[in-house]
Amino acid sequence: MQEVVLLDESSGPPSQLLWTRQDTQLPQESALLPAPYPAFTKDGSQGNLPQADITLMSQAQESVTFEDVAVNFTNREWQCLTYAQRHLYKDVMLENYGNMVSLGFPFPKPPLISHLEREVDPCVQDPQDRESLSCSYPVSADKMWPENEKASSQQEIFENGEAYWMKFNSLLKVDSRDPKVREVCVQDVKLENQWETSIREKLREEKEGSEEVTCKKGKNQKVLSKNLNPNSKHSQCNKVLIAQKLHECARCGKNFSWHSDLILHEQIHSGEKPHVCNECGKAFKTRNQLSMHRIIHTGEKPFNCTQCGKAFNSRSALCRHKKTHSGEKPHECRDCGKAFKTRNRLCMHQLIHTGEKPYKCNCCGKAFQFKHSLTIHGRIHTGEKPYECEECGKAFSGSSDLTKHIRIHTGERPYECSKCGRAFSRSSDLSKHKRIHTREKHYGCPQCGKDFSIKAELTKHRRIHTEEKRYRCEECGKAFRHNCKRRAHEREHTGEKPYQCRDCGKTFQDKHCLTIHQRIHTGEKPYKCLECGKAFSGKSNLTNHRRIHTGEKPHKCEVCGMAFHHSSVLRQHKRIHTGEKPYTCSECGTSFRQGSALIGHKRVHTGEKPYECEECGKAFRVSSNLTGHKKRKHQVWSTHELDGSRKSLSPVTVSQTSVVSILTSA
């Protein structure tokens, strides 16, 4: 059985020769279709072809069937094709069949089409029945269509046929051991190159003209070129050999070179998505888009990076990845000069300068600059949280939120400050931290004049003036100014402690508490008192310490009027009036007002004495007992009251005579 491929394009180079293929052994990296061969000029003449070829072209008198535009493969040849090539083959065959049906050709549905529609590999021939690739005789156009339909049918099928040939020409390569076939193919390339060169030269000569040239064929008028001299012989329809963008969209006026591109474009206006994925039900405008989508379900990644070996499921993703190695950023913003690897990233960035927010939420009316942001925001209304942590089961609405959360478990901090070396788990935290070094404070409070380096901090601060507490606990009704405080409070009800120390395994309800705790292991004390030089691991500890120097006691008991430096001390003091003892020992049932007192009491049962004197080696259950021991036995003092003012000093060891002399001088 012979397989015939008919390919032509009325607006392209001179018509192409019809090839038949008789099968031969196929090398592993070759395919079967030859390149197009010029046979007809625009006016239907046979151009500058050898006489032997013209004789061959006059012998075929067959009518067109689907087999004339079909290509079959053997099992061996089919295995040589990649995943993408197989789907491209299916796309072309189905589109060929659809176009022939739309033109009214009377023939039953071929078995090949039935197999393709059922997603079954196409039927193939045995390799024994296939001999060699040879150049066959072209079919006469007079016998292909009835006389009254020849012009319109031939024009349309050829226009579509060229688009299909362009697809296959990139997919399939010529393979032939026949010297005659190879010679004809070489002649084809030479003629086509000469044709393109001559056209470019003639268009360059006629470039000074500006009048629009049109070609009238029947009822249709199509623009051919806008840069031809109206007096030139090339302005005549039958002498113009190349047409630019013949196919125009009736809705928006956009022009296309190929009829198939116009059909795909029209689906944008209609919103039609005829190609549906059988796995997930997602619809696509083109079969090629569906084919690329199916790779997601199969997990296949046919496109590999030659430098690092990383695989991708699309060629575009591979191209974007390659720019990572080269560092190339060809797309530059005209406003700020920032460069990007892809044009899509540049377009997204430019929305920052324009302030445009084209994506609007239908539920609440909030607008966003990026479609991805709108998608994540929409999950607030739907309650959808598709991204779940495998370690703790917590779910998130965005993949980036899950990535940040996972770093809590792994302890990863990829963002490091170049000035002080401090690392952060989020890039936004690093950006905020850098303002400490630059001392930038762009955001000022209009009520008290206090400046802030971060806008979010100013927003939180202004709630102090308004006394707004918008975040309310659903369990007890307690209200908070900040959402993070409410979340931390809710964990007191649930008992959840999601933040774990990697060094000792201790867990915390609040991330801030974990950060301060980790400084115990690292010895880091970033907050230093400017008056006495004492350093602290937490900012709140420094704030409380400063009140020793200032004598400030802002936290006052409403019952007895006693004032305290710290709010936690006031809470503990209030329990004296209420008699509350919330901390109970599970061993003996004894209750305590303070959690630290319970911890010290538990060591009575366990016998643990973690506080050891460096001088004599004596150990104690509570740190206060060790402090008293040092004062009594070793004269180690931590604080002194001189001249009626209380000053904080670092612990020092002094002799008995030194203490007496200090007190005497006072």
From Swiss-Prot:
A GO molecular-function descriptor: RNA polymerase II cis-regulatory region sequence-specific DNA binding
C2H2-type zinc finger locations on the chain: 247-269, 275-297, 303-325, 331-353, 359-381, 387-409, 415-437, 443-465, 471-493, 499-521, 527-549, 555-577, 583-605, 611-634
The keyword Cell cycle belongs to this UniProt entry's keyword annotation: no
InterPro entries tied to this protein: KRAB, KRAB_dom_sf, Krueppel_C2H2_ZnFinger, Znf_C2H2_sf, Znf_C2H2_type
CC per GO annotation: nucleus
Keyword presence, S-adenosyl-L-methionine: no
SMART domains reported for this sequence: KRAB (SM00349), ZnF_C2H2 (SM00355)
Subcellular location: Nucleus
Domain of life: Eukaryota
Domain KRAB stretches: 64-135
Family, as annotated: Belongs to the krueppel C2H2-type zinc-finger protein family.
Protein name, UniProt field: Zinc finger protein 311
Native source species: Homo sapiens
Gene name per UniProt: ZNF311
